[in-house]
Each structure stands twice: as C-alpha cells, then as structure tokens.
Amino acid sequence: MSDLDTLLMETLAQVAFAADEGELENVRVGALGKKGTISALLATLGKMSPDERKVQGAAINALKDKVNEALAERRLILKEQKLEARLAAEIIDVTLPVLPRPEELGRIHPITQVMDELAAIFAEMGFAIAEGPDIETDDYNFTKLNFPPDHPARDMHDTFFFEPDAQGQRKVLRTHTSPVQVRTMLTQKPPIRVICPGRTYRCDSDQTHTPMFHQVEGLVIDKSAHLGHLKWILEEFCKAFFEVPDVKMRFRPSYFPFTEPSMEVDIQCSRKGGEIRFGEGEDWLEILGCGMVHPNVLRNCGLDPDVYQGFAWGMGIDRIAMLKYGMPDLRAFFEADIRWLNHYGFRPLDMPSLLSGLSS
C-alpha cells in the first residue's frame, strides 16, 4: 500500500469519526489547510521532474477530491443529525395541557363575531353566503352596476385604482361588495337569495371612516320579489341583530345607480344619557341603504327584467358593530390593541345562534 493510500484511509477515518461540524472543520484544516498534510504533498511537486510531477500530481489531486467529497457527505449528515436533535428537543406533546400564558384565552374580534351573527340571522331566512375577490375589474365594480362614466366613485380621490394593464384596463380595490352580487347573477339561475360580506376599500379616513372597512350586502332575485318582502327582511334582521322585541323603521327616498327606487333606512332609537337604545325613543338613526334592483343591472347580468325582479341592501358591518356594542372609534378596530380586544372581544366558543342568543 502506498503512502497516499495510507493517508487517504487515515483521513477518511477521521472524517467518519468527526462528531460535530467543529471537529469536521479541524479534520479539513489538518488535511487541506495551508499547513495540511495534503497541501504539504502538493508543495513537493515543484521539486519533482516533469514526468514525476505528472504522475504524482494526478494522484494527489485525486486524493484531494476524495477527501473533499467525504467532507461534504459528512457535513450533510451532521447537519441532518443536528436538525433532528433540535426537532426532537422542540417536540410538542399535544396531549398535555397548555402551559399558562399571560393571555390564557384569545378573543374573537368584534368584526368576526358580527359577521357570524349576520350569517346566523340570514341563514334562518334561507340566505346563502357568496364571496368574491377584493381586487375587481372596473366592469364588475362600476359598469355592470349601472354607474355612469362620470360618477364621482370613479374618481381617483374616492377609489383605489391599480396601474393600467397591457390592455389599458385598470383594476380597483372593490368599493363595495356589490360585484359579488353581479358574479352571483351571472353564474346562478334565479331564484337567488344571498348575502355578500367582506372587506371593501375607499379613500377615506377619520373617526368613523377607514380606508378599509367591512360591508354586507343582500340580494334577492325572483319573479315576484317586491318591497314588502324587503321591508319584512330588514325588520326581522334589526330585531334579531339588536336583540329587541320590536323596531320601527322609516324608508326615505334616495339614489343609488344600481337600484330603482332607492331608499335609505332609519331605525327608531333613544339617545338619552349619551347611550343609543333601539326599539324605543323618538330619534332616528340611518343604518343602511336599499332598493329594487335596477332593470339595467338585471340586463347586464343576463336576466330579463320583464321576467325577474329583485331587491338589494347594504350596510357597514363596522358601523352596526359600533352601534350594537358601544364602540366610539372605528380606527380602534384595526390597531391590534390587546386591551381593546379583551374589553370588546368575544370568547372563542361563543357561536352566535338565534336560539341561544347572538351575543350571549
């Protein structure tokens, strides 16, 4: 056995027995470092004849390559062993009780709670939930909803527009959840009965407005849907949501591009002592907008307005949450203040239902 074979066996043995990356690095330096054994052999090549240098150079380089290969393999094994040891040390036994934390229980955000309340109320009336993308086309957000080209909502100061695409079309962050109604009418055949909750976006920010907020809209399409049905649905919703035995509502004429006639709805309330109470008093508070779906919207969605008609409504989820639970500032909803959430949040297992109470 030649000296090179002996050196290779000894070096490979040292590599194999290296217990960690530190020991492996010492082996590498001892063999391939500036003063290493293999480096020393390479330094002797200059004293050899050309023929000897050719033979010995090839042999020493082959030795060096084998050592480098062994070092790389061992390094990979050691890294895997280190990872396995760390994972074993960090394993969590899910059968054991959770260790105490400063916040022993999380809280459900009021917006999530109110969305669940809305779903529970309208599910009892036979409504399904429809959802759509936050980023919408101008066609779905405006055109199919009968917005005229010069409507203020199409202005940059009111709507978040994206840069035009290659075809020159601009997408928007949806300004309402009405595009979900459009998508529903385009993909489903009547009768339709859905609510559309979700995030919406507008260029506005103050104590009662934020650039992102939450909205729920409702849509009913059928051959005989009329304002009487709309009035009953909204009255039943308000009684269930605000948990009062009776409510008085008034419908005021208004204008929305996508409904005709259009109305805004006020609910009777009392403001005594700085507290708003529904179902009593002599004051009125606006809570939502509604109306019969405009014939142009039906046509844009492939429905014959001579056969089908329907109604729709929309309200701010953040706003009705503030009214029901006495929250004075909308901006606090998005500040992630654990103290605020502990005060206004809900227990995780409190699932709203009309039978057990929405906010019990």
From Swiss-Prot:
The entry's keywords: Aminoacyl-tRNA synthetase, ATP-binding, Cytoplasm, Ligase, Magnesium, Metal-binding, Nucleotide-binding, Protein biosynthesis
Coiled-coil residues: none
Signal peptide: none
Enzyme Commission code(s) on record: 6.1.1.20
Keyword Nucleotide-binding appears in the UniProt entry: yes
Pfam families: Phe_tRNA-synt_N, tRNA-synt_2d
Cofactor binding note of this UniProt entry: Binds 2 magnesium ions per tetramer.
Gene3D superfamilies cross-referenced by the UniProt entry: Bira Bifunctional Protein, Domain 2
Any single biological process term in GO: phenylalanyl-tRNA aminoacylation
GO cellular component: cytoplasm
Reactions the enzyme catalyzes: tRNA(Phe) + L-phenylalanine + ATP = L-phenylalanyl-tRNA(Phe) + AMP + diphosphate + H(+)
An MF annotation (GO) of this entry: ATP binding
Residues noted as binding Mg(2+) in the record, renumbered to the chain: E260
Compartment(s) where it occurs, according to its Swiss-Prot or TrEMBL record: Cytoplasm
Cofactor: Mg(2+)
InterPro entries given in the database record: aa-tRNA-synth_II, aa-tRNA-synth_II/BPL/LPL, Phe-tRNA-synth_IIc_asu, Phe-tRNA_ligase_II_N, Phe_tRNA_ligase_alpha1_bac, Phenylalanyl-tRNA_Synthase, tRNA-bd_arm
Main location: cytoplasm
Enzyme class: ligase
Sequence similarity: Belongs to the class-II aminoacyl-tRNA synthetase family. Phe-tRNA synthetase alpha subunit type 1 subfamily.
NCBIfam families on file: pheS
HAMAP family: Phe_tRNA_synth_alpha1
Quaternary structure (record): Tetramer of two alpha and two beta subunits.
Protein name: Phenylalanine--tRNA ligase alpha subunit
Gene source species: Beijerinckia indica subsp. indica (strain ATCC 9039 / DSM 1715 / NCIMB 8712)
